[in-house]
Amino acid sequence: MRNVYLGYFLEAFVVAGLTEETCKFLFLRTTWRSPAFDFQFDAIVYAVMVALGFAAFENVKYVYSYGFATGLVRAVTAVPGHAIFGVFMGYFYGYAKLSDYWGREDDCRAYLALSVVVPVLMHGCYDFLAFAQESDGRFTLLFYAYLIALYVFGILRVNRSARADRRVSRETVFDYFRRMQYPVPPQYRDRNDDFWR
């Protein structure tokens, strides 16, 4: 029985958690130099979008392989789980961007590492409990308690991060439009620079 749980552990933390969260992080990393990434909370938005894109792709694969019922179960468990992992990835990614903005390279690297490590651990715990509850019913209650805790902490993290949002770029979107010589959208032409700061 111990070997079964070791297999679940390796599958959950290494195969699923590490691989999937690293892939999501690599996609997220493409936003680092985007002029649209000018506020800390943007990191959470980008990370959740990447996570939901991954979850949609994964769900299509599961529905195709195991049927529609599996897709329905995953829609209320795995898909929100990926979104919550994305929230925490984005939270630390946003702090990495803020640290970079302030010129704190060591903090930036540490937060970038945390933006992968924390979601890997969260994802690994989720998958381990999901695998274990399939073979031992005693894990079912623990799995759903963990799922509810993820939802609650994820929502709290989003709310707190939204309230504490800070600028992480010196260039505003308006500055970017001017630099790239893009036309300013008509509804914003009469706004002064203070509107964008």
What does each model-identified segment do?
Residues 1-197:
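Hydrophobic alpha-helical segments at protein termini of multi-pass membrane proteins
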